[in-house]
Curated annotation (Swiss-Prot):
GO terms for molecular function: structural constituent of ribosome. The gene is rps6e. SMART domains: Ribosomal_S6e. It comes from the Archaea. One of its GO terms (cellular component) is ribosome. Belongs to the eukaryotic ribosomal protein eS6 family. One of its GO terms (biological process) is translation. The keyword Transcription does not apply. It comes from Sulfolobus acidocaldarius (strain ATCC 33909 / DSM 639 / JCM 8929 / NBRC 15157 / NCIMB 11770). InterPro entries: Ribosomal_eS6 (IPR001377), Ribosomal_eS6_arc (IPR020924). Pfam families: Ribosomal_S6e (PF01092). The keyword Lipoprotein does not apply. Keywords: Ribonucleoprotein, Ribosomal protein. This is Small ribosomal subunit protein eS6.
Length: 213
C-alpha cells in the first residue's frame, strides 16, 4: 500500500517577509523519526521577536542554495516552530538530523513563513482518511503535531486528478471544460478526460489540503 503524499498549503500566507538567520544545532530540539524523509514534521526554536518580524504563525521555512557541480541547488526545510526566548536574536535552533539534510551543523539560511509543505504518510496509519471527500475537514496528528486540514483535491497512482463535481471514488471518462484534468488552450473548448471522483480511496496517492484555523 503506497504512502499518502499530503500537500498542506497555508492560505493565509500572502506576502513573504524574509530574513537571513544563523541556523545552529541544539540538543534542546528533539529529532522526530522520519523528519528528513518528510514522514514527520521537524521542530525549530526561535525567539518571539523573530516570530513577529517574519509574521509567523505555526510554520517556518529555511532555505539555502548550494553549489553542486556546475549548478546551484536549493535545499528547503519546513519546520513547526517553538517559541523559546533563550534563543539569541538572529538565530534559529534545529535538530541534528535536520542539519544533516542541509549538510552542516551551523550555517546561514533564508527564513520565511511556510507557504506549503508535503508529508509522506503510511496509509495504514490514517484509516479514517479513506472515504472522506473533497471539501471535508480532517484532523491528523503527525509526530505530536495536530493539523486541521480541508481536502481540496488530489490524484491517483496513474496521475488522474480528483474532481469535486464527480461523485464516488472510481475513475470515469467525462466531458470537461477546465481544470482539474484539462487545461484548454482556448475558452469554450471541451474534451473527454479520465478523472477520479471526489472520494479518497487507497488508489489515491496525493491529497491536496489547506490548513484550517
Amino acid at each position: 500500500m503506497p504512502d499518502f503524499k499530503i500537500v498542506v498549503s497555508d492560505p493565509k500566507t500572502k506576502e513573504d517577509k524574509k530574513e537571513k538567520l544563523k541556523v545552529k544545532v541544539s540538543d534542546k530540539v528533539k529529532s522526530n523519526q522520519g523528519e528528513k524523509e518528510g514522514k514527520a514534521i521537524p521542530l525549530a526554536r526561535i525567539n518571539d521577536k523573530i516570530k513577529q518580524a517574519l509574521n509567523l504563525d505555526d510554520f517556518l521555512t529555511l532555505e539555502i542554495t548550494k553549489q553542486e557541480g556546475d549548478k546551484k541547488v536549493k535545499i528547503k526545510g519546513h519546520f513547526k516552530i517553538e517559541v523559546d526566548n533563550t534563543v539569541p536574536d538572529g538565530e534559529v535552533w534545529i535538530s541534528k538530523s535536520m542539519a544533516e539534510k542541509f549538510g552542516a551543523e551551523e550555517f546561514e539560511a533564508l527564513a520565511y513563513r511556510t507557504r506549503a509543505f508535503q508529508l509522506s504518510l503510511d496509509q495504514s496509519k490514517l484509516p479514517n482518511l479513506v472515504g472522506t471527500k473533497i471539501g471535508d475537514v480532517i484532523d491528523i496528528n503527525v509526530s505530536g503535531v495536530n493539523l486541521k486540514l480541508k481536502i481540496t483535491g488530489g490524484s491517483d497512482n496513474s496521475g488522474f486528478s480528483m474532481r469535486f463535481d464527480v461523485g464516488g471514488g472510481a475513475k470515469r471518462k467525462i466531458l470537461v471544460s477546465g481544470p482539474p484534468g484539462y487545461y484548454p488552450k482556448e475558452d469554450g473548448l471541451r474534451r473527454k478526460r479520465t478523472v477520479r471522483g471526489n472520494m479518497i480511496t487507497p488508489e489515491i496517492v496525493q491529497i491536496n489540503t489547506i490548513m484550517i484555523r
